[in-house]
A protein has these predicted regions:
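Long, C-terminal-biased catalytic regions of enzyme "large/alpha" subunits
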Residues: 1-241
Length: 241
């Protein structure tokens, strides 16, 4: 793939120079950073939005400079974190205590995402987030939360059409949980330890299937339990339609 073979004793990193490999600088918690300065409802404040864009622009400038200095390709990764959303928040709770709308939530928001507790329309969420990925060449994801829309697929198509030339990667989160005991299809109810069928209260991972967007990927938190902070974040999500 690199068009060359190393000689005995040569360092393997020679193959990765000239930007042939990527080192990513990830970030989470942009929502919380702006909340510390502008309050919890800053998403509609143009000054606050520009403040967050300046943060990611600064990260991008640093990675570009590192690429010139070291010869590798450095990129900014708008991270859909899994365990760090819990770990970083716990560390800050130890240092700063429970700060309203920041550490008090027990999780940090992924990358540049809109506060999951709020319910903008899918179009408003896309419009808010679309300005960040240009500074996140290492990867990113947008997503919107929906109720069951089996009888209204045109609603999803309207969002997809709107997103087509505005964002590069859009996840669609619709409830597809299933209980094999009572036959329920829909969305399971979050509990302190996981999720349960709202109809028969079943929570046995052997007899139910629960699908949630854990970070960037879709996971089954009943079969593979997630960290506390991510569970709280998923349980806090509201629908955008």
């Amino acid at each position: 793939a690199f068009g060359q073979r190393l000689k005995d004793g040569e360092a393997v990193d020679l193959l990765f120079k000239n930007r042939r490999a990527t080192v990513s600088l990830g970030y989470i918690g942009l929502y919380e950073a702006a909340t510390a300065f502008f309050g919890p409802n800053w998403e509609t404040n143009p000054e606050a939005k520009e403040f967050t864009l300046e943060i990611v622009k600064a990260l991008k400038a640093h990675t570009d400079a590192w690429g010139d200095e070291y010869g590798y390709h450095f990129s900014v990764y708008a991270t859909p974190s899994e365990s760090l959303t819990d770990r970083f928040c716990k560390l800050d709770i130890e240092k700063f205590g429970l700060v309203p709308d920041i550490t008090e939530k027990e999780y940090y928001t992924n990358s540049f995402h809109y506060d999951v507790r709020k319910n903008p329309t899918p179009f408003e969420k896309i419009d808010f987030e679309k300005d960040y990925p240009v500074f996140s060449s290492g990867g990113f994801i947008h997503y919107c939360e929906y109720p069951v829309l089996r009888q209204n697929p045109k609603a999803l198509e309207a969002v997809w059409d709107y997103a087509y030339d505005r964002v590069g990667y859009l996840g669609t989160n619709t409830p597809i949980d299933h209980c094999y005991k009572c036959g329920y299809d829909g969305e399971f109810t979050p509990t302190a330890k996981g999720f349960e069928c709202p109809q028969c209260k079943n929570h046995d991972p052997q007899t139910c299937d629960v699908v949630k967007r854990t970070c960037g990927y879709l996971g089954n938190p009943q079969a593979r339990p997630m960290v506390h902070g991510r569970h709280v974040e998923i349980s806090s999500r509201v629908k955008h339609m």
